[in-house]
């Protein structure tokens, strides 16, 4: 297949799956992927998923790929907590929550991890846009914190919560108007209620 024709069809999406390609071009030869990978036109994201090489410098492109190559999912936990200033460490791994099974991928755009939750816990996120309007699902800081504590059972003592070094000012901000309590209630988890109670005790919010 002519690469220029292929690029014109898919480049606006920055990445694509083999399923999408076959739907658009039923007689597509998968051998083209090897050729285009060898020429540096595209990069492999994961099995049957590829991205165009020239989008690498697009701000936020990793955020976008995180949601595209494993869906449904949304960015959450440490990645969003760091971005919101809730934890002091910078986080280079794209951490997401999904209703699919737990998974992880590594490619030229970064490391991507996905933690599995029940479908009914897939809430508390909104859509942001990067590049030329590419959509990204991102948890609110309150939901990111709750996802993190729900999925990491070791944070169950005052000492462990204190070791997170959460920013008290950011915590206070996300606790306003009962936003944090509302998220906690939707989980229906006694363990999460207990951990958030410890957070409030340690950071006096």
What function would you assign to each model-found segment?
Residues 1-72, 108:
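Short beta-edge/loop segments at beta->alpha junctions of small alpha/beta modules
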Residues 3, 18, 77, 141-142:
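Structural motif detector for alpha-helix initiation sites
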Residues 15, 111, 163:
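A residue-level signal for beta-strand positions that form part of recognition/binding surfaces
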Residues 26, 85, 150-154:
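Hydrophobic/aromatic-lined pockets within catalytic cores
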Residues 28-29, 87, 190:
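Short coil/loop linkers at secondary-structure junctions
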Residues 37, 43-52, 62-123:
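Short gly/ser-rich loop at a beta-strand->alpha-helix junction or flexible surface loop bordering the NTP-binding
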Residues 125-205:
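Hydrophobic alpha-helical interaction segments
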């Amino acid at each position: 297949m002519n690469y220029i024709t292929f690029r014109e069809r898919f480049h606006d999406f920055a990445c694509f799956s083999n399923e999408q390609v076959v739907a658009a071009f039923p007689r597509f030869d998968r051998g083209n992927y090897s050729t285009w990978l060898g020429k540096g036109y595209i990069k492999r994201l994961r099995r049957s998923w590829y991205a165009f090489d020239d989008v690498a410098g697009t701000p936020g492109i990793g955020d976008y790929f995180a949601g595209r190559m494993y869906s449904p999912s949304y960015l959450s936990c440490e990645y969003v907590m760091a971005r919101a200033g809730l934890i002091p460490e910078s986080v280079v791994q794209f951490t997401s929550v999904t209703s699919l099974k737990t998974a992880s991928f590594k490619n030229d755009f970064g490391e991507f991890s996905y933690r599995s939750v029940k479908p009914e816990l897939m809430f508390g996120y909104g859509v942001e846009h990067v590049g030329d309007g590419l959509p990204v699902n991102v948890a609110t800081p309150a939901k990111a914190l709750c996802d993190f504590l729900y999925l990491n059972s070791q944070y169950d003592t005052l000492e462990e919560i204190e070791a997170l070094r959460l920013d008290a000012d950011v915590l206070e901000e996300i606790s306003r108007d009962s936003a944090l309590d509302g998220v906690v209630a939707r989980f229906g988890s006694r363990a999460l209620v207990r951990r958030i109670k410890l957070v409030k005790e340690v950071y006096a919010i």
